[in-house]
């Protein structure tokens, strides 16, 4: 490629609406342009990166015998009604009517479509196992699109689906995908963790997320420094909560006899220690709206995902605000406590182990102090409802935990018979019996990978792409070609040789000042730069500059091709 024939579309200034570094650099480097909220045009530089990621994914899919297909973007709404997921996705679905007044959806995912296809296509166990995949644009009506392509209304995904006659076969394929994803992300050179996760709206029993580490990520993961333990913080359990499950049957409630002394709020000279917060949330019991109380240590954070797992809690989770608490309970939320509440009370496991603690008294400006379970208060319903912390011991016994922000770039699920039962997908067994098939599904967020790699690889000058997905691997930067025939000859000759060697190279043949040329190339992030200048050409040498460390080396012209091939691991 010659720069004179290429659309760079770089910007000098950072657009004011771009808040995170990946969004800023994708706009500045000319990878994308915003069309509307959460909707972007992909420009040539962005497309080149996307295509290289797709190629890596396709190569790995071929290794596990996955067959490429292409499913429609438009899906009949009836399929989603059959699976029961229409209400779960709710307003996130783009829905529309055709001219015949039939209802359709722009697909955010393809479980319904692919299950319907298999139901009509596969009849016998002899046709299984089967793995199919596609790379396609998906749609989701995000309420608040943000962070550029990290949370957008349309995005590109690789989604794969596997079909099996039994659970053992599904587990084998699941493990193949798990390793395949590790291979993909290692080739892309992205820092990630594979973590235990919840299946959420996808259903199924077992799932793993692949999370790219990023300070601007929306997710949080917890992992051990010393062991293989890693989990999404939503599902992470401490050793304390696991041990409680083993001993909870031995809890014997006592008759409550004593009454606790109170202490005025203004008597506390320091922040209150050993304090239990009481938080009200909405519930639905027998379809009747009501309230429940959640008890948690002052220093802990509620885990919204775990709370929604409680049957009676209203979904989505809804907290009672300050004004409502004062109206309903006659007290400010700060002084709300569990004593005397006539509603269900759920306490975190860590709260159960507390002694001589402080709670709100349900009287403004007063607390109960030195409170104990089974003495002053009946033991409530104990649940794991908080986020794990660095001070916790993980479920595998690790005492050295890290909690990091991350971006989800992949997710794999063992769906089991979740969809085949709902949509009645049966195949004939060896003995002429019919049974529901087992399914797995496996997603990679291709556009999210682009943002995640940039979040991990940049400096003050721009993006620093890994070789494997850089828009170009090598750029040739000739200086003063108009006045030096030798520079022009060497430049053209090197360009032809590199193209012949199948090296992805761009020749910067635009008539620009060196400063503009170098700034543009650094911003785009081409990893290997060859500078051909009058300063060194008389010695038959060119300057090699590596983008990731900005180090320069003089290389003989006749050795530069071998040098680059070695750098690119081509020999």
UniProtKB/Swiss-Prot annotation:
Sequence intervals crossing the membrane: none
CDD domains: ProRS-INS, ProRS_anticodon_short, ProRS_core_prok
Enzyme Commission number(s) from the entry: 6.1.1.15
Keywords: Aminoacyl-tRNA synthetase, ATP-binding, Cytoplasm, Ligase, Nucleotide-binding, Protein biosynthesis
InterPro entries in the record: aa-tRNA-synt_IIb, aa-tRNA-synth_II, aa-tRNA-synth_II/BPL/LPL, Anticodon-bd, Anticodon-bd_dom_sf, Pro-tRNA-ligase_IIa, Pro-tRNA-synth_IIa_bac-type, Pro-tRNA-Synthase_IIa_type1
One GO term of the biological process aspect: prolyl-tRNA aminoacylation
Gene this protein is translated from: proS
Function summary: Catalyzes the attachment of proline to tRNA(Pro) in a two-step reaction: proline is first activated by ATP to form Pro-AMP and then transferred to the acceptor end of tRNA(Pro). As ProRS can inadvertently accommodate and process non-cognate amino acids such as alanine and cysteine, to avoid such errors it has two additional distinct editing activities against alanine. One activity is designated as 'pretransfer' editing and involves the tRNA(Pro)-independent hydrolysis of activated Ala-AMP.
Record's catalysed reaction(s): tRNA(Pro) + L-proline + ATP = L-prolyl-tRNA(Pro) + AMP + diphosphate
Molecular function as annotated in GO: aminoacyl-tRNA deacylase activity; ATP binding; proline-tRNA ligase activity
PROSITE patterns per record: AA_TRNA_LIGASE_II (PS50862)
Mitochondrion keyword on record: no
Family: Belongs to the class-II aminoacyl-tRNA synthetase family. ProS type 1 subfamily.
Cellular localisation: Cytoplasm
Signal peptide (residue range): none
Group of enzyme by EC: ligase
Domain-level remarks: Consists of three domains: the N-terminal catalytic domain, the editing domain and the C-terminal anticodon-binding domain.
Subunit structure: Homodimer.
Source species of the chain: Buchnera aphidicola subsp. Schizaphis graminum (strain Sg)
Protein name: Proline--tRNA ligase
One CC-aspect GO term: cytosol
